[in-house]
Structure formats: structure tokens, C-alpha cells
Amino acid sequence: MAEKAMNKEFEELFQKLIARPLGMKSSHFTPVNTDGGHAPMLGGGLCTTLHDYMRFLDMIYHNGVFEEKQILKPETIHEMQADQVGNAEVHPGEYVERALKKYHTGIYGLGEWRELIDEATGEAYQISSPGWAGAYPWINKQDRVYGFFIAHVQGSSQKEDGFSSFYGSPVISQTVSNIISLKR
């Protein structure tokens, strides 16, 4: 949709509107097929560094602002984190229930899992965007913390002993929040 609206390739838009303003010098999207002429792989195709991605998380955490510069509008951030599935049927065992032992139907925003929800407002206070290969970026607005856990998993994310980096990563954000709570 962005390519059609702006009449530009996705990578060009990403670089101009997100990467360069955030100083993400080592970030780009890989194409689905590297033979040339293929669209970028938006799900799991970002090649980046921890330094670059933390700049992106910092901007999201600060409501679209990075180093006193508005990169994304606050309304855009709000829409990204809003419930995008409404009253859709959420089957037992979906990511939020399986990974966090929480159940709610508003599990997905735009490119973000709505992991933890304020029951009074319906607003997500913890969002994430985990990858099957072990990447787990998260933001917890209630505990005022965000981070990025990276583990490279070869082959299937699900191991013989039942461990899955995709489903296991949220333990890290919960542990960080618990430690912060003890320090306050």
C-alpha cells in the first residue's frame, strides 16, 4: 500500500522515512528472492544491528519521537498498538496465550503483538514483535522499559526438548520487569 500511495519502492521509503532519520546506518530489508526484481521480505527480512534496532524501539517507546525529532506521528504509534482484530475469534494456543499464559482477543496491532493489556482501558502496555529465529524486541510502557533479546536459532524454532525461542522469549521481558519492580 505504501509503495502504491507514494509511487516508490518499499526499501526507498524505509530508508527515507525511518532508517535515515533514526540513524539506522546498517539496516535494510532483504528481498524474498535475491535473484533480483523481487519485493522485500517484510516479515523477518530486516537485516539490522542491535544498535540500529534500539533506535527504532526508542522512537516507538517515545511515541514517535527520537532525539527530539518527530519521526512518526503519535496517532500512527497509537494505531500500530491498537486492537486490529476486534472481536475476531482467537483460537486457544495462539501466541499471547501460549507464550504469556494470558488470554484476550485483542492480540494483534499493526506489526506488533499486544501482549499485555490494561483491562480498564483496553490499551496494550506491553507490545512485541518476536521472530521465529530468536529475536525478541519488546516495550513495556507500564514498567517504563524496552529491550531487544537476540538468540540465533538454527533450523526449526521448536527443539526436541520442547523449547521454542519464539514462545520462550517473553520470559525475558517478564524477568526484566520483575527485577525493575524490586529495585523501585
Predicted regions: what they are:
Residues 1-18, 52-63, 143-148:
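Alpha-helical scaffold elements that line and support the substrate/ligand-binding pocket
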Residues 70-74, 78-79, 90:
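A penicillin-recognizing enzyme superfamily signal
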Residues 11, 15, 50, 54-57, ...:
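Extracytoplasmic/secreted envelope proteins and their assembly/folding machinery
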Residues 1-4, 41-44, 66-67:
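Second-shell loop/turn segments in exported
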Residues 5-30, 69-74:
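Short, well-structured active-site flanking segments
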Residues 144-157, 161:
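Short, well-ordered beta-strand elements
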Residues 85-95, 117, 156-184:
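Short, gly/Ser/Thr-rich active-site loops of penicillin-recognizing serine hydrolases
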